[in-house]
Amino acid sequence: MAFSIKMRASKGDKHISGAETIVMEKENIENITAGYIKRALEHELGAPDFINIKIDKINKKDIIYIDALPIKTINCKNKEDARRVAKNLLKNEGISDKLIEKSFKIIDDGGMRGAPILNLNGERLEPDKERGVRVKNISTTEELKEKILKNNIGTDRTVDAIAIASKVINLGVIAELCTSDNNSYTTGYVATKNGYFRITNLKQENENGGRVFFVKNDTNIEDLIYKLENKPYIIK
């Protein structure tokens, strides 16, 4: 058996921190959970008043292994330049200007615990509009993490995000737009079938963050949400 470890921390209704991984040996559970608790308690958004650790058994045969999306960093001098880059990447996937503007407004308004799912008509498909949808049961291999960090391809946040992005694109999501909910981290990304594009200055310091998923109009939304939340993926 393998084990899925998830951490969520909050203060009142405000999300503070979240992390998760999949471990193959139960001996690793204690160190991982201790690290997650430390991460939550020392978060820049403030000390949480609630930390939840959840550990679930997973059958190793149910885990899907996929390659990470190729990572490319696009350096932008300011938010306006960065958003123009993001917009062009999304337009290349058939997403309209109007829908892109709507997605940025959702992100900039903040406050969501998960991500909204928008079809190409601009309709929100997730059943709980306040909660959104969370991508769960994901992890990266140590080899991928080491490659990203040692080669200066990205940061620890990149390691976390590449797992989400690679899984959602593998499940048929057209694109993902994301900025961090950490106040000081201004690099965001667009993920498509063509790669994971890190974009510097996609938001300014102390602005809200969030993510949006774009899907085809004929997407089976119940099936997609089930797989996003429950199907275990390890990204290599």
UniProtKB/Swiss-Prot annotation:
Its cofactor is Mg(2+). Keywords: ATP-binding, Biotin biosynthesis, Ligase, Magnesium, Nucleotide-binding. Pfam families: BioW (PF03744). Coiled coil: none annotated. Its EC number is 6.2.1.14. It is an enzyme of class 6 (ligase). InterPro entries: BioW. GO terms for molecular function: 6-carboxyhexanoate-CoA ligase activity; ATP binding; magnesium ion binding. It comes from the Archaea. Pathway: Metabolic intermediate metabolism; pimeloyl-CoA biosynthesis; pimeloyl-CoA from pimelate: step 1/1. GO terms for biological process: biotin biosynthetic process. It catalyses: heptanedioate + ATP + CoA = 6-carboxyhexanoyl-CoA + AMP + diphosphate. Catalyzes the transformation of pimelate into pimeloyl-CoA with concomitant hydrolysis of ATP to AMP. Belongs to the BioW family. NCBIfam families: bioW, PRK01322.1. Homodimer. This is 6-carboxyhexanoate--CoA ligase. The gene is bioW.
